Amino acid sequence: MISVHEAKFEDMALAADIMVTSFRTAFADFVSPETMNACSNPVNCRAMLESIYQERNMYFLMGSNHGFICWQATETGAEIVAIHSLPESWGTGLGHAMLSEALKQIGDCPAYLWAFKENTRARRFYEKHGFHWDGTERVSEFDGALEVRYANEHC
């Protein structure tokens, strides 16, 4: 059974492990080995997530100890900053449960997120959940990869 609950500070160690595993699997085809090594260091990921967790207007949910999602309240809505799950949970409904609960908590306001342009699996997932590419692109700080912005204006 899938459960989604508010994350605690102590969950950031597990979230970092999930992020590293997810990152290494999902982004292997379009991130350089150097960037992969730099961005998938468990100690650095944990420190980053612990820092983000303590920021104002940041919200975290854990999904069945196999995934997490975090978002930030903005002046115009909410930015979903990260959604990661262990590869063995892909396609099980975990991502759907986490994103649905996050959107429920975000409420009646626009939400957006950034996805690697080459990450077709993630883009299909977001489209399935009511997000659409709004035409905005940017160069990511991750290896200069192109990112596209997805919006869900009818939360």
Predicted regions and their residues:
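Extreme N-terminal starter segment of soluble prokaryotic enzymes
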Residues: M1-V4
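Acetyl-CoA-dependent GNAT
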Residues: E6-M12, A16-W90, H96-Q105, V139, ...
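A general structural motif
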Residues: D108-P110
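C-terminal "cap" of GNAT-fold acetyltransferases
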Residues: Y112-R123, K128-H129, D134-C155
